[in-house]
A protein has these predicted regions:
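Transmembrane-helix signature of 12-pass secondary carriers
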Residues: 1-457
């Protein structure tokens, strides 16, 4: 495998890094944005999920658009949209402006998640396709790691006395820092060639051969040229592809396989874990600072097991990874469900006396009351303190009130993340890049990715 091929695959997959960074950063941002704009739970949910809804739109059209204009041009547009989203998010002055900014980012990652594995599959050989397409998932989890690390340090140095890093503007820095990897992505894409398979489809044979020679060397390039010509000749026997062609009996089985894997990936709840990681860890009662640092642990486990997946995917095969991983996911989620179901919530009088925030004395009448679930407890807190005051101090309150087997829950969460990272995470994108004939690839992957994003929303 050439260094050139690795470099190109990594650069193209940087859209995945930005997706992971955006998805991870929002878990910490909402701790500040909620009180800043006095958002309801529904509005918080929309700010978090807005990119997923926008991504669905991009997923419908980006594959087809890249078939016409080329993968590289659309990827450049993706990088530009990421940069715009980061700037607008950092300077958002209203809830509506922040939502719009995040939807622009959603358009970017919706297209990036489809086009990166598609492009990599078109420049790689059969022997290394699995590991190269998995770089997309590696970049996603590296993005999560960078986001949780960023959140941790911004939260650590946030102070009411600090001019720039205080509760009113620290979230702007969290969102705005995404601009730097977005610009790097945009500039790096200029060093990426156009897809040789796409060039062949557009009858640009000389440029396609030049690209293959640069990537694989002359000897291997000849073999890849022959493979591309055969696959394209076969595709040209078919009529111009239409959306309805996906329903053909010859494609039905592979469409069902892709859709099942796409749905399964999201019904595990993986995005909810990442989007609300800080809130979930707070709910275990470990405190705000520990919740932010636990996010680093979570993303570190993800990175480690993604590397394991990349090592095994072309050796053990796709199917064994899926079977073992989904079994582990099921067991881990059962552990989490049991742990949270046994949790109770109770504030003691001495806890309330230690609170120094506004209206904390209003909690004295409920001292000693035990709540059997977090929903009732949180609603009571919001009624007594108000939504804004509770949102600013929820970590402190939950740390004092929560009685839970935190170790069991943490084992469940980390087990779930580990099993997902070496199975459904990377394997889905590898499967999608291999399942469909090149003529149908843009539409087919777009449909599966649309359904995948819809489930996550």
């Amino acid at each position: 495998m050439s260094k050139k091929l690795l470099f190109i695959s990594f650069v193209v997959s940087l859209g995945g890094f930005l997706f992971g960074f955006d998805a991870g950063i929002i878990s910490g941002v909402m701790s500040y944005v909620g009180p800043e704009f006095n958002l309801t739970d529904g509005q918080i949910g929309w700010v978090v999920s807005a990119p997923s809804w926008a991504a669905m739109i991009a997923m419908i059209f980006s594959g087809r658009l890249s078939d016409r204009l080329g993968r590289k041009k659309i990827l450049l547009l993706v990088a530009f949209l990421y940069a715009v989203s980061a700037l607008l998010s950092a300077y958002a002055i209203t809830y509506e402006m922040l939502s719009l900014a995040r939807m622009i980012g959603g358009l970017a990652f919706g297209a990036a998640l489809i086009l990166a594995p598609m492009y990599i599959a078109e420049i790689s050989t059969a022997e290394n396709r699995g590991v190269l397409v998995s770089i997309q998932q590696l970049n996603i989890v590296l993005g999560f790691f960078a986001a949780f690390l960023s959140n941790y340090f911004f939260n650590k140095y946030n102070s009411p006395e600090h001019l720039f890093l205080n509760d009113e503007n620290v979230w702007r820095w969290m969102l705005g820092v995404e601009l730097f990897p977005a610009l790097l992505y945009f500039l790096a894409l200029f060093f990426v060639p156009r897809s040789p398979r796409w060039l062949y489809l557009k009858n640009k044979y000389i440029e396609a051969k030049q690209v293959l020679n640069q990537i694989h060397g002359k000897n291997r390039a000849e073999k890849e040229i022959s493979s591309i010509e055969k696959s394209i000749d076969k595709d040209k026997e078919l009529q111009q592809v239409k959306w309805t062609d996906i329903l053909k009996s010859s494609l039905r089985f592979i469409m069902i396989v892709g859709l099942v894997v796409g749905v399964l990936q999201q019904i595990t709840g993986i995005n909810a874990i990442y989007f609300y990681a800080t809130s979930i860890f707070k709910q275990t009662g470990i405190g705000t600072n520990a919740a932010f640092s636990s996010g680093i642990l979570l993303s570190s486990v993800t990175v480690l097991f993604t590397f394991i997946a990349m090592y095994l995917i072309d050796r053990a095969g796709r199917r064994p990874l899926l079977l073992v991983g989904t079994a582990g996911i099921a067991i881990s989620l059962l552990l989490c469900a049991f742990g949270f179901s046994q949790a109770t919530y109770q504030l003691k009088l001495q806890d309330i006396y230690h609170f120094k925030f506004e209206k904390s004395e209003n909690l004295i009448p409920i001292a000693g009351n035990e709540y059997q679930n977090d929903v009732d407890f949180k609603e009571e807190m919001k009624t007594i303190l108000g939504n804004s005051t509770y949102s600013k101090n929820d970590g402190l309150i939950l740390e004092a009130a929560t009685q839970i087997n935190a170790t069991l829950v943490m084992v469940g969460i980390l087990g779930f993340i580990a099993c997902f990272a070496f199975s459904l995470g990377p394997v889905m994108w590898v499967l999608l890049s291999e399942l469909y004939p090149i003529k149908y690839r843009g539409i087919a992957i777009g449909i599966v990715a649309f359904v995948n994003s819809f489930i996550s929303s």
